[in-house]
């Protein structure tokens, strides 16, 4: 069901591999297939955002989890979760998995680390499997910190052993890059899939596309009204309501 993706070009992936040596199962071209407990793990020589062998992921599981570093302009110790997507296309989002990982990260985070749920951003874009990034930020010190990277393993162990029956599958449109509704996810008010950030050109076509790119049907959408101008805001609301999706306006 699950498959881990680790990239040798990524320092967090390398630290994770130091902590958790994984036996080699087979090699497919430049891709190694290893085993993390009972979960297949793909080890790739490049960067996480450059991974291109979705066919290998699809042969091993349905839900891919990328182990990765997090970078930001004003670095601070941070654990993050997000779905990848280089707009206007995106990966398949997994609201249940992403939200479970986020809650587990927050549970196991320790000072000075904080946790954040990020808007959908950067490659790769998937269509056959869901993709979820789980990250440690935001400098070399944190990327190589075995205790910090060990929190990712704790979150994986906790999240992947849970039954994924959860609250309302929800997406958000027009939020900030570091989403402002993460506390609601933490409290279990809903499970969050794609978050369309306010800084992209938001269109009805994008909304139509991301609705199709979730592992479960979206039942609710949170729209940040001040960040989406009319007439496009009204068009998006009408589109969602016509599909029977609950719309909540914020701001």
Curated annotation (Swiss-Prot):
An annotated Gene Ontology molecular function: D-aminoacyl-tRNA deacylase activity
InterPro entries: Deacylase_DtdA_archaea, DtdA
Annotated EC: 3.1.1.96
Requisite cofactors: Zn(2+)
GO BP annotation list: D-amino acid catabolic process
UniProt key word Lipoprotein: no
Catalyzed reaction equations: a D-aminoacyl-tRNA + H2O = a tRNA + a D-alpha-amino acid + H(+); glycyl-tRNA(Ala) + H2O = tRNA(Ala) + glycine + H(+)
Domain of life: Archaea
Cofactor binding mode and count: Binds 2 Zn(2+) ions per subunit.
SUPFAM superfamilies given in the database record: AF0625-like
Keyword annotations: Hydrolase, Metal-binding, Zinc
Record function comment: D-aminoacyl-tRNA deacylase with broad substrate specificity. By recycling D-aminoacyl-tRNA to D-amino acids and free tRNA molecules, this enzyme counteracts the toxicity associated with the formation of D-aminoacyl-tRNA entities in vivo.
Subunit composition and interactions: Monomer.
Protein family per UniProt: Belongs to the DtdA deacylase family.
Protein name, UniProt field: D-aminoacyl-tRNA deacylase
Species the sequence originates in: Pyrobaculum aerophilum (strain ATCC 51768 / DSM 7523 / JCM 9630 / CIP 104966 / NBRC 100827 / IM2)
Lineage, uppermost ranks: Archaea, Thermoproteota, Thermoprotei, Thermoproteales, Thermoproteaceae
Gene: dtdA
């Amino acid at each position: 069901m699950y498959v881990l993706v680790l990239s040798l070009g990524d320092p967090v992936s390398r630290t994770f591999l130091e902590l958790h040596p994984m036996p080699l199962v087979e090699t497919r071209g430049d891709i190694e297939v290893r085993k993390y407990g009972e979960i297949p793990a793909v080890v790739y020589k490049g960067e996480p955002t450059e991974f291109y062998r979705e066919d290998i992921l699809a042969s091993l599981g349905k839900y891919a989890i990328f182990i990765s570093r997090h970078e930001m302009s004003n670095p601070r110790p941070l654990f993050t979760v997000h779905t990848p997507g280089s707009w206007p296309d995106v990966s398949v989002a997994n609201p249940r998995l992403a939200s479970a990982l986020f809650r587990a990260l927050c549970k196991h985070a320790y000072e000075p680390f904080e946790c954040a749920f990020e808007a959908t951003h950067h490659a790769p874009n998937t269509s056959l499997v869901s993709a979820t990034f789980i990250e440690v930020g935001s400098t070399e010190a944190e990327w190589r910190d075995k205790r910090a990277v060990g929190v990712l393993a704790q979150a994986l162990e906790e999240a992947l052993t849970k039954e994924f029956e959860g609250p309302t599958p929800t997406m958000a449109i027009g939020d900030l890059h570091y989403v402002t509704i993460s506390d609601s996810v933490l409290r279990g008010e809903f499970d969050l899939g794609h978050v369309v950030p306010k800084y992209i050109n938001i269109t009805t076509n994008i909304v139509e596309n991301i609705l199709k790119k979730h592992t479960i049907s979206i039942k609710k959408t949170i729209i940040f009204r001040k960040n989406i101008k009319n007439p496009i805001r009204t068009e998006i609301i009408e589109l969602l309501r016509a599909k029977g999706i609950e719309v909540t306006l914020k701001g």
